[in-house]
Amino acid sequence: MGFTTKIIFLYNLVLVYAGFDDPRKAIELVQKRYGRPCDCSGGQVSEPPSDRVSQVTCSGKTAYLMPDQRWKCKSIPKDTSPSGPLQECPCNSYQSSVHSSCYTSYQQCRSGNKTYYTATLLKTQTGGTSDVQVLGSTNKLIQSPCNGIKGQSICWSTTAPIHVSDGGGPLDTTRIKSVQRKLEEIHKALYPELQYHPLAIPKVRDNLMVDAQTLNILNATYNLLLMSNTSLVDDCWLCLKLGPPTPLAIPNFLLSYVTRSSDNISCLIIPPLLVQPMQFSNSSCLFSPSYNSTEEIDLGHVAFSNCTSITNVTGPICAVNGSVFLCGNNMAYTYLPTNWTGLCVLATLLPDIDIIPGDEPVPIPAIDHFIYRPKRAIQFIPLLAGLGITAAFTTGATGLGVSVTQYTKLSNQLISDVQILSSTIQDLQDQVDSLAEVVLQNRRGLDLLTAEQGGICLALQEKCCFYVNKSGIVRDKIKTLQEELERRRKDLASNPLWTGLQGLLPYLLPFLGPLLTLLLLLTIGPCIFNRLTAFINDKLNIIHAMVLTQQYQVLRTDEEAQD
């Protein structure tokens, strides 16, 4: 009976998944139900939750991941400074920093020749390190304290110390703006902008149609879905949210960065970009220590991922192959200058796009928009779930069927779009300034020539004395940048190693999983079979011996017979 029970038990072991079942269903269900961090599926809170797992900085709020996988959000304090000259600070002592969870609004004030922040203290708390341990006790992000008397005014500096965070408040915002300003100065020093003479500005072109960069992002996303999930992309809608884009960031496990030198001057520099980190748990981090220098650029520490390893960086570095550096306050950078300090991880960007299946009814503008009528919620599918990336990070080999090169292209497209947008806005400002100077100069000259007639307006009998020329400089700049982007793509494609990977990798990766499984079975299978056969033979020999001994009686020895 015992041997039969063991045989049945061994047979049933084949039917047990032992926890290695495909987690795609569970991961996709969590992704669909709770959404992205900045969606705030868990609602709003007035205080940072004490049991939070991690936190992500969003535009105007901070999202906290709870143990039930919901994201709860807390609004950051608002600046209520009155217009006009700053008032005197109502404080006798000034602190270096105050955490943003200890007040709901703040103002700017002046004391002497310096500007400070002031607010009413709602609670007191001691400062300390963040809840997320990055590696060791010396690499934690320090949180600001809340010292003072509850209900009274407090004042603090407008610049936070190095590696000190106020929880997404005005100090963190000032730090991000300072980093952006310094990166723009570095970019202008490396790449001087093309200047037009005021009298040689290109003439007006035709009006621009739909933004070409948005169409490129949608086309790249469609091609990526076509390679990974053909059944979904056959009939679906790709939906982009209105408002400022917040791309998704997924881990990049390859340390794809290069040290910038004089020979490598083609590093793409973009302004700091706010992103939503997804699927980060353990990552390889890049660390640059602080030397207490006034010229340091504090990028902060990552607060959404643990660091399994840390690489010390001492010089300027550039992200390559469409990757970005993700640092404190989940801000993305493509270039880290010489004097940067902080803790960052490498990531790849994906657009914040939702997918609607073709059989899902999509509402169109109708009378419902004017007369309220409850409408059924649309079932959106997040892009990460549609691509199978969520399961790929869990199983490791499940998502190998999607080509890595396609993710690189899509991330590269997003980075280029941000750089183009920044350059275009700068050109718009320069155009307005140059046109204003030309108009004023010409106006003065014409007024002098027609002074006897009362000026140029009275001489021409015009009702409107000002005219702004709509120049085509912005359109020419966009065209030039698009040509430059195409040139860089051709340079990347001319690399034999990258071209070889792009041509063979998508076809080899789908067979890699079954091939590794077959090799594993051929290597370990004979050993397991031999052990199982030996075990069964031993049990059969024992049973055979027991059956034979039942037909005989044991003979008594001479001593037992005498007794």
UniProtKB/Swiss-Prot annotation:
Specific enzymatic cleavages in vivo yield mature proteins. Envelope glycoproteins are synthesized as an inactive precursor that is N-glycosylated and processed likely by host cell furin or by a furin-like protease in the Golgi to yield the mature SU and TM proteins. The cleavage site between SU and TM requires the minimal sequence [KR]-X-[KR]-R. The R-peptide is released from the C-terminus of the cytoplasmic tail of the TM protein upon particle formation as a result of proteolytic cleavage by the viral protease. Cleavage of this peptide is required for TM to become fusogenic. The CXXC motif is highly conserved across a broad range of retroviral envelope proteins. It is thought to participate in the formation of a labile disulfide bond possibly with the CX6CC motif present in the transmembrane protein. Isomerization of the intersubunit disulfide bond to an SU intrachain disulfide bond is thought to occur upon receptor recognition in order to allow membrane fusion. Glycans are attached at residues 113, 219, 229, 264, 282, 292, 306, 312, 321, 339, 469. A motif (YXXL motif) lies at residues 552-555. The chain crosses the membrane at residues 504-524. GO terms for biological process: fusion of virus membrane with host plasma membrane; symbiont entry into host cell; virion attachment to host cell. A lipid is attached at residue 527 (S-palmitoyl cysteine). Keywords: Cleavage on pair of basic residues, Coiled coil, Disulfide bond, Fusion of virus membrane with host cell membrane, Fusion of virus membrane with host membrane, Glycoprotein, Host cell membrane, Host membrane, Host-virus interaction, Lipoprotein, Membrane, Palmitate, Signal, Transmembrane, Transmembrane helix, Viral attachment to host cell, Viral envelope protein, Viral penetration into host cytoplasm, Virion, Virus entry into host cell. SUPFAM superfamilies: Virus ectodomain. The keyword Chloroplast does not apply. Residues 1-18 form the signal peptide. Pfam families: TLV_coat. Residues 380-400 are annotated as: Fusion peptide. The 17 amino acids long immunosuppressive region is present in many retroviral envelope proteins. Synthetic peptides derived from this relatively conserved sequence inhibit immune function in vitro and in vivo. The YXXL motif is involved in determining the exact site of viral release at the surface of infected mononuclear cells and promotes endocytosis. The mature envelope protein (Env) consists of a trimer of SU-TM heterodimers attached by a labile interchain disulfide bond. The surface protein (SU) attaches the virus to the host cell by binding to its receptor. This interaction triggers the refolding of the transmembrane protein (TM) and is thought to activate its fusogenic potential by unmasking its fusion peptide. Fusion occurs at the host cell plasma membrane. This is Envelope glycoprotein. The gene is env.
